[in-house]
A protein has these predicted regions:
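Acidic, contiguous N-terminal accessory segments
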Residues: 1-100
Length: 102
């Protein structure tokens, strides 16, 4: 799976999860607003121990989980998820990603 910039840690897991393919058509800013407001199958949690722009994104066969401490981290996670949704037309490879700016 190609994501730019390459996350600091990414583990590919078996399986896939299907998000609504229409999400792939949204521009990034609109996609971020959808993630923030709530997308079926995507759970967003606040984890105060994560750094300001740090995030964890996990895709499992049952859905997507995003953890961040604030909107900056959530935006970075949404950017990564947007790339995945766009490339796979909604079909996401299961994976565990943790990233923050270097």
């Amino acid at each position: 799976m190609m994501i730019f910039p390459q996350p600091q840690q990414m583990d590919i897991l078996p399986g896939a999860y299907q998000l609504c393919a229409d999400l792939a058509k949204l521009p990034l800013v609109d996609f971020f607003q959808q993630v923030k407001a709530g997308i079926p199958g995507v759970t967003v949690t606040t984890e105060p121990l994560l750094g300001k722009e740090e995030y964890r994104l996990t895709v499992e066969e049952g859905g997507v989980a995003i953890a961040s401490s604030c909107d900056e981290g959530l935006f970075r996670a949404a950017t990564t998820l947007h790339q995945m949704v766009t490339k796979g037309e909604g079909k996401l490879e299961c994976c565990a990603i943790q990233d923050k700016p270097a």
